[in-house]
A protein has these predicted regions:
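Intrinsically disordered, low-complexity, mixed-charge
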Residues: 1-117
């Protein structure tokens, strides 16, 4: 199942997340890059992403792209990253039509989640 379908199924298709913040993170950090397409610019996506990432102690960055998509590069426990994705999908202002994902090697030297311009 692709990531976009997984997110929709996990939220029950109604944009209300059914998952909660995990009690304990997995011990091994992972880093992923996500490209979100749809109505994701001009709707506060970057600020919501930063807030959700901060709540989950995730690090990385988010940036608008010239093609109208938004790229998020995020690092932390895999189950916390899943909770981040559920939180993003639950925001009703966003109309996410596609998510592309790429696994990256962890950097392990970032200390915060930033908005890049």
């Amino acid at each position: 199942m692709d990531l976009f379908r997984w997110i929709k199924n996990a939220c029950g298709g109604n944009r209300r997340p059914v998952a909660h913040i995990p009690d304990t993170p997995h011990t091994q950090p992972v880093r992923r890059r996500y490209r979100f397409s749809g109505r994701v610019q001009g709707v506060g996506f970057r600020y919501e992403a930063k807030g959700i990432a901060a709540q989950l102690s995730l690090v990385g960055w988010v940036r608008n792209q010239s093609d109208g998509s938004v790229v998020v590069e995020i690092e932390g426990a895999a189950n916390y990253i899943e909770a981040f994705l559920l939180g993003i999908y639950a925001v009703p202002r966003f109309d996410i039509t596609d998510v592309q994902t790429e696994d990256l090697p962890p950097l392990k030297n970032e200390t915060a989640f930033r908005i890049l311009y």
